[in-house]
Amino acid sequence: MAQQRRGGFKRRKKVDFIAANKIEVVDYKDTELLKRFISERGKILPRRVTGTSAKNQRKVVNAIKRARVMALLPFVAEDQN
C-alpha cells in the first residue's frame, strides 16, 4: 500500500519568463534569451521545467530551431573531455 507523504516541501510556482518580462516577439537572433530554454547538453527544455505557457513554448521552440539552422546555437553541446 502506498503511504501518504507528510510534511514535505512547498513547490515553487513556475513563472512564464516571456510573459513576465512582456516579451512580444521571441527572435531567433536573441541567443541570450534562447539559452535559458536549452539544457547544458543542448536539448530544448520542456514546459514543465521552464514554466512557459504553451503558446510561448511554441515560439521558443521555433526560434531555437531557426537559430540552430542559422548556426547561432549548437545542435548538441561540446564534449567536456
Swiss-Prot record:
GO MF annotation list: small ribosomal subunit rRNA binding; structural constituent of ribosome
Database matches in Pfam families: Ribosomal_S18 (PF01084)
PROSITE patterns: RIBOSOMAL_S18
Keywords: Ribonucleoprotein, Ribosomal protein, RNA-binding, rRNA-binding
GO CC terms: cytosolic small ribosomal subunit
Family listed: Belongs to the bacterial ribosomal protein bS18 family.
Designated name of the protein: Small ribosomal subunit protein bS18
